[in-house]
């Protein structure tokens, strides 16, 4: 807890160096009207709708296995107990931290649109592989790698949505992006009966396969906006 608190304090202190911006003119509008306008704006732009759809998919089909279902996996699959659960959670989030540091260092010339697609596809593939794993050591390695790849999906995804939005719409667009988390409780709600009915391994295979196919469909359907190297979404990512 002390380390987490220290990170929050450090983040706050670093935020003090962010350049200020002149206040925008006040605009009186109903919050629901703003939300509807944001959804309509995202719906009209493939370079926003694609990332939003992918964000919803990873919440629906990928995050459940490293969040709500991880205690089940630790107990029923790895027979690891409380300590094993801690190791599993730490493996994923340590990988995510390492990936975030690599992305944030801006040492790699990432094409953000392509990066979020290929890393999303690898992430869903890792869900399938994790479901087939019954060895704790291999599970830890897979979770670390998954967390690492996860950062190459989520961070560029946010960059694409910010870059593709007009300045006056960025706040509302990112608000819509946050609503993608609604996929997580839905994914968890569906996973319970599926695991009871068809088993854990089949459920991970189903979730991972659906996510992988949907990611490929996003990349193909909106390839001009997200995959082509000339697309604005693939301008050099500066971290």
Identify the meaning behind each predicted range.
Residues 28, 60, 180-181:
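A generic secondary-structure micro-motif detector
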Residues 51-52, 60-73, 156:
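Short helix-kink/termination motifs in transmembrane helices of multi-pass secondary transporters
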Residues 11, 18-19:
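Conserved beta/loop motifs at nucleotide-recognition and modification sites
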Residues 20-53, 237-239:
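Juxtamembrane intracellular "pre-TM" segments in multi-pass secondary transporters
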Residues 1-9, 13, 36, 43, ...:
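C-terminal transmembrane bundle of multi-pass solute transporters/carriers
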């Amino acid at each position: 807890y002390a380390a987490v608190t220290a990170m929050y304090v450090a983040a706050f202190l670093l935020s003090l160096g962010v350049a200020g911006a002149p206040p925008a003119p006040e605009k009186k509008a109903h919050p629901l009207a703003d939300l509807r306008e944001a959804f309509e704006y995202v719906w009209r732009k493939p370079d926003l709708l694609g990332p939003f759809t992918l964000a919803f998919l990873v919440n629906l089909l990928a995050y459940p296995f490293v969040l709500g279902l991880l205690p089940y996996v630790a107990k029923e699959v790895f027979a690891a107990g409380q300590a094993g659960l801690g190791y599993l959670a730490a493996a994923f989030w340590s990988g995510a931290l390492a990936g975030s540091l690599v992305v944030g260092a801006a040492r790699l010339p990432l094409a953000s649109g392509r990066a979020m697609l290929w890393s999303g596809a690898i992430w869903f593939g890792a869900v399938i592989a994790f479901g087939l794993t019954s060895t704790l050591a291999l599970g830890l390695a897979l979770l670390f790698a998954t967390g690492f790849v996860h950062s190459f999906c989520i961070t560029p995804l946010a960059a694409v949505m910010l870059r593709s939005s007009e300045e006056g719409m960025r706040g509302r667009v990112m608000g819509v992006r946050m609503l993608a988390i609604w996929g997580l409780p839905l994914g968890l709600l569906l996973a319970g009966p599926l695991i009871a009915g068809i088993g854990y391994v089949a459920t991970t295979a189903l979730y991972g396969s659906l996510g992988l196919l949907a990611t490929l469909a996003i990349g193909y359907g909106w390839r001009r906006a997200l995959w082509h190297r000339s697309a604005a979404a693939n301008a050099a990512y500066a971290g």
